[in-house]
């Protein structure tokens, strides 16, 4: 819908341009009446005081005055827009520009610009200066916006007053949905006929879906345009009225933002929660610090006592060795340096033993599943404790090395013969004269090599290297160091480190009796346990070579594998297993959440290409078989060349404890939805089993009681947040299955696509309307392609917690999050806040990848 513009050339005005610039009227308007008008204006009196001025001459004066303003501004004519551009496209782009304006920008700022710009135009703002006045960088859109606002206000001409400018400004900065929608249609309706053809509707759909990165809707623009025309043009007139489309959009948006609050009591509860959640600050510093400490201890008491015990044991060992060597003759020569070195060495022995325990996954899984130690021991923090111990080792190595290299050895070289004599039985009868004597000794070589290997392993274990964050910054040959592979292989250098540690401890200075060489005593049990676990993994993987039954390739570089399930492979939803593909690397094992349920007769994993190994395994599978259409499975029977896959597990994870809670909040970010998918399927299975048991007349009470104790979940909320529309294809069939089987409405599903502008934004209003129409007609969501309606933009997590707290007062809610660390802090903080300020207790569990 384009507006046809006619440009009428005013030759008289051109001829009299010099007269205009000189301040005199053109001859066309020179007559006695107009002379009087001119005098009146010069005198500052009102034009209305001249009774001889008729309406025709007044209009002529206005036209002449506008031309004067145009000439004064240095423009012979107003700039014209490129009408070849899409009207809907300009409108959508314009909404983006408007959204960037600061609604809180003081009107006084705009007013100052207005006064400055109109200083020479008698308080009238030119159309060409509108963008500059309101602070809009896009001059082209500023002109378009001016025209739209002028049409809406029934203003004609290219100038406005301050009052009209203020009215325009208020409409621009009204960010309500209704106002934005009105502005959108005002921008489109350039000829003010209020009509849209099917082609224009199709164009709007394509542009809106493109702006929201929804290729699925863009590809079906013809179908959706026909659906809108069928809805709004039942008489087949060939066009629809904008007002009708506007009402439909408003209706869809009203439904999307409506809430379930249907009673005054619930509204009052919501207000009370909002009031209680307002931040308060105690003026008493001591009381405030005490409250913060108390809340921290209550929320993290498991971590607190474990860390406190660890620090206490280290302090005792350090103090014991310090005092022991302070009372020996060597203290007279080496002083506190030897005490520091020996104290640090004792903590090193402890930590080198402890650091293996958190990665003994089979042992931890057994303790988690078979004992009640999980009540006191934070098994979920095993890797965090592993990292904390690593920091303790680094500190101990630094103190021990510096004390020996920078203090003890120089003091021994500088000691007098009399001072050295008592130490001869430990360092040799002949006093060393060179520093190299200590460096090239067995103790020195083993110690330095250990430090060197530890530095390599510790450095490449840092997140910047392990997650590949530095890959782009490193030069070509070093890029491979910033990868999970480099971390995995260099961590196996600790096999050498432990061998050297035993040798270093055996040839230790100042101790000759075997029973005083305690390094092997510290390491014996943890090393044996860890070695046993690695042997178990090797044995299990050799007999658990699974067959790939099906595979599927999905958008977003996700590979799904369905594998045969070994006979004795028993697991719980939320757990994970290690996967090895010899065709990629015979040594590398990578953990993946199990997306199938314990009741399924197969195992499934979803592998997203996030690193070198995951990209490699996708490449291997794509080479041996032609990639299937998106979401279609390839059967292993028809493709026997699938690569060999080995598995090891299952292993415990935080999400497996969901059955302990009556209410669970499951949050998956991107591929982090994988453990949650298994859980919600398991909830459906357990719910159906529970209903069947309750309906059975036979069966022992003990069996029913046992099922009640193992499965407590009565309500589940699942939030899946992803930025790509194609991601929903990963679990499309599962979502449809859950929506169909969940007869009791136990699970509340929420899919959020963050590429779409938030609900309430006009740029996504058309998508919301199409979503509502298509769901009502076909029962499918146009974004996800499932029976579950999708939401736009990121969830308001505070509102999510608030709604759950309102619906389940006094309940213990388990919050399980899997995804990138970006959300961890916010979700944990909200769990603490609502736990402290409401009757609902939220227990937060995370699983980052």
UniProtKB/Swiss-Prot annotation:
Which segments does the topology annotation call Cytoplasmic?
A: 1-303, 410-444, 511-518, 681-849
Please name the CDD domains in this protein's record.
Answer: EFh (cd00051), NOX_Duox_like_FAD_NADP (cd06186)
Protein name (record): Putative respiratory burst oxidase homolog protein G
Transmembrane portions of the chain:
304-324, 393-409, 445-465, 490-510, 519-536, 660-680
Topology Extracellular: residue spans: 325-392, 466-489, 537-659
Q: Name one GO cellular component term.
A: plant-type vacuole
Keyword DNA repair recorded: no
Role played: Calcium-dependent NADPH oxidase that generates superoxide.
Native organism is Arabidopsis thaliana
Region described as Disordered: spans on this chain: 1-53
Topology within the bilayer: Multi-pass membrane protein
**What is the annotated localization of this protein?**
Membrane
Compositionally biased intervals (Low complexity): 18-27
Binding annotation for Ca(2+): 189, 191, 193, 195, 200
For this protein, the record's InterPro entries field holds: Cyt_b245_heavy_chain, EF-hand-dom_pair, EF_Hand_1_Ca_BS, EF_hand_dom, FAD-bd_8, FAD-bd_FR_type, Fe3_Rdtase_TM_dom, Fe_red_NAD-bd_6
Q: Where is the composition biased (Basic and acidic residues)?
A: 1-17
Fill in the subunit field for this protein: Monomer and homodimer.
Q: Which residues form the Ferric oxidoreductase domain?
A: 342-502
- Annotated region EF-hand-like 2: the residues are 153-164
Protein family: Belongs to the RBOH (TC 5.B.1.3) family.
Q: Where is the EF-hand domain?
A: 176-211, 220-255
Superkingdom per UniProt? Eukaryota
Stretches the record annotates as EF-hand-like 1: 118-128
User: EC number(s) of the enzyme?
Assistant: 1.11.1.-, 1.6.3.-
């Amino acid at each position: 819908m384009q507006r046809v513009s006619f440009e009428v050339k005013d030759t008289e005005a051109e001829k009299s341009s010099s007269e205009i610039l000189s301040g005199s009227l053109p001859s066309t308007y020179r007559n006695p009446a107009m002379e009087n008008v001119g005098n009146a204006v010069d005198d500052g009196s009102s034009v209305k005081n001249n009774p001889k001025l008729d309406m025709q001459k007044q209009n002529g004066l206005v036209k002449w005055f506008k031309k004067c303003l145009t000439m004064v501004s240095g423009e012979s004519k107003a700039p014209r827009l490129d009408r070849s551009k899409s009207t809907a496209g300009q409108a959508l782009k314009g909404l983006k520009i408007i959204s960037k304006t600061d609604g809180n920008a003081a009107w006084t700022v705009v007013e100052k610009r207005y006064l400055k710009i109109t200083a020479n135009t008698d308080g009238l703002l030119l159309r060409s200066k509108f963008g500059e006045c309101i602070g809009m960088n896009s001059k082209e859109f500023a002109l378009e916006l001016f025209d739209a606002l002028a049409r809406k206000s029934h203003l004609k001409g290219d100038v406005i007053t301050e009052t009209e400018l203020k009215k325009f400004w208020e409409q621009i900065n009204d960010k309500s949905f209704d106002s934005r929608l009105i502005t959108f249609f005002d921008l489109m309706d350039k000829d003010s006929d209020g009509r849209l053809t099917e082609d224009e509707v199709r164009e709007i759909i394509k542009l809106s879906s493109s702006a929201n990165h929804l290729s699925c809707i863009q590809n079906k623009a013809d179908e959706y345009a026909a659906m809108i025309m069928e809805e709004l043009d039942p008489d087949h007139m060939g066009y629809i009225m904008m007002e009708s489309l506007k009402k439909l959009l408003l209706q869809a948006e009203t439904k999307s933002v409506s809430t379930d609050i249907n009673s005054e009591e619930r509204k009052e509860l919501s207000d009370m929660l909002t009031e209680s959640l307002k931040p308060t600050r105690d003026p008493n510093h001591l009381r405030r610090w005490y409250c913060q400490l108390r809340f921290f201890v209550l929320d993290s008491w498991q971590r607190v006592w474990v860390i406190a015990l660890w620090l206490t044991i280290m302090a005792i060992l350090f103090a014991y060795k310090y005092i022991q060597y302070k009372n020996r003759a060597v203290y007279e020569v080496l002083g506190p340096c030897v005490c520091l070195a020996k104290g640090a060495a004792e903590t090193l022995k402890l930590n080198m033993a402890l650091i293996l325990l958190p990665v003994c996954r089979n042992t931890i899984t057994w303790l988690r599943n078979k004992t009640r130690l999980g009540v006191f021991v934070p098994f979920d923090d095993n890797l965090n404790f592993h990292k904390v111990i690593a920091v303790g080792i680094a500190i101990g190595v630094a103190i021990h090395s510096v004390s020996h290299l920078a203090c003890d050895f120089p003091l021994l070289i500088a000691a007098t013969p009399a001072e050295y004599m008592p130490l001869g039985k430990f360092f040799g009868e002949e006093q060393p004269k060179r520093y190299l004597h200590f460096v090239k000794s067995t103790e020195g070589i083993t110690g330095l090599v250990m430090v060197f290997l530890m530095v390599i392993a510790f450095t490449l274990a840092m997140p910047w290297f392990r997650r590949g964050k530095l890959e782009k910054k490193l030069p070509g040959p070093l890029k491979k160091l910033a990868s999970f592979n480099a971390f995995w292989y260099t961590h196996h250098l600790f096999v050498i480190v432990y061998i050297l540690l035993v040798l270093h401890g055996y040839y230790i200075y100042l101790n000759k009796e075997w029973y005083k060489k305690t390094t092997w005593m510290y390491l014996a049990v943890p090393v044996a346990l860890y070695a046993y676990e690695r042997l178990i993994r090797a044995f299990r993987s050799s007999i658990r070579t699974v067959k790939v039954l099906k595979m599927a390739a999905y958008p977003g570089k996700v590979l799904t594998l369905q594998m045969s399930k070994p006979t004795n492979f028993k697991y719980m939803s939320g757990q994970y297993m290690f996967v090895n593909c010899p065709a990629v690397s015979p040594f590398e094992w990578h953990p993946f959440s199990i997306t199938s349920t314990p009741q399924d007769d197969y195992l499934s994993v979803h592998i997203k290409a996030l690193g070198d190994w995951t990209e490699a395994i996708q490449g291997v599978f794509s080479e041996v078989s032609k990639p299937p259409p998106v979401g279609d499975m390839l059967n292993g029977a028809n493709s026997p060349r699938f690569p060999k896959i080995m598995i090891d597990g299952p292993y415990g994870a935080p999400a497996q404890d969901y059955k302990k809670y009556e209410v669970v909040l499951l949050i998956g970010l991107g591929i982090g939805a994988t453990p949650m998918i298994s859980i919600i399927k398991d909830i459906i299975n357990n719910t159906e089993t529970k209903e069947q048991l309750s309906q059975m007349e036979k069966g022992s009470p003990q069996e029913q009681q046992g099922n009640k104790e193992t499965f407590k979940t009565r309500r589940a909320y699942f939030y899946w947040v992803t930025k790509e529309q194609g991601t929903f294809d990963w679990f499309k069939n599962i979502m449809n299955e859950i929506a169909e089987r969940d007869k009791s409405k136990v699970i509340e599903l929420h899919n959020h696509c963050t590429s779409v502008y938030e609900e309430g934004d006009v740029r996504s209003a058309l998508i919301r309307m199409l979503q509502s129409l298509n769901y009502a007609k076909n029962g499918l969501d146009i974004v996800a392609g499932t029976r579950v309606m999708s939401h736009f933009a990121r969830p308001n997590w505070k509102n999510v917690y608030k709604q759950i707290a309102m619906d389940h007062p006094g309940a213990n809610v388990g919050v399980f999050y899997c995804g990138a660390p970006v959300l961890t802090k916010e979700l944990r903080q909200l769990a603490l806040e609502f736990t402290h300020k409401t009757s609902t207790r939220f227990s937060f569990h995370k699983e980052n990848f």
